[in-house]
From Swiss-Prot:
It comes from the Eukaryota. Plays an important role in the elongation step of protein synthesis. The modification Phosphoserine is found at residue 103. InterPro entries: P1/P2_N_sf (IPR038716), Ribosomal_P1/P2 (IPR027534). The gene is RPP1C. One of its GO terms (molecular function) is structural constituent of ribosome. This is Large ribosomal subunit protein P1y. GO terms for cellular component: cytosolic ribosome; plastid; ribonucleoprotein complex. P1 and P2 exist as dimers at the large ribosomal subunit. Residues 86-113 are annotated as: Disordered. The keyword Ribonucleoprotein applies.
Length: 113
């Protein structure tokens, strides 16, 4: 669970990045203080070090792009046997072509007969 300090520093880093200003611990602390948020003194330093090592714009653009274990499994299937991968879409198309079965319809057991 994130804390107020993490959120405040995250927003400060995004503001600085958006404005094209160099991201430093002092600037993060200044923005957080201007917002009236009280945080522990180590947060700005941690976020400034992160911004030095990572491209913040890339991090923002890739939010939610990570996947669980599903992508490697799907990528491994064509490598293992291409025929099986081709057969799966054909099965899906076959299912789509079939008309939907009618519901049970009126069987004479009406609730308000």
């Amino acid at each position: 669970m994130s804390t107020v300090g993490e959120l405040a520093c995250s927003y400060a880093v995004m503001i600085l990045e958006d404005e094209g200003i160099a991201i430093t611990a002092d600037k993060i602390a200044t923005l957080v203080k201007a917002a009236g948020v009280t945080i522990e003194s180590y947060w700005p330093m941690l976020f400034a070090k992160m911004a030095e090592k990572r491209n913040v714009t890339d991090l923002i653009m890739n939010v939610g792009a990570g996947g669980g274990g599903g992508a490697p499994v799907a990528a491994a299937a064509p490598a293992a046997g291409g025929g099986a991968a081709a057969a799966a879409p054909a099965a899906e198309e076959k299912k789509k072509d079939e008309p939907a079965e009618e519901s049970d319809g009126d069987l004479g057991f009406g609730l308000f007969d």
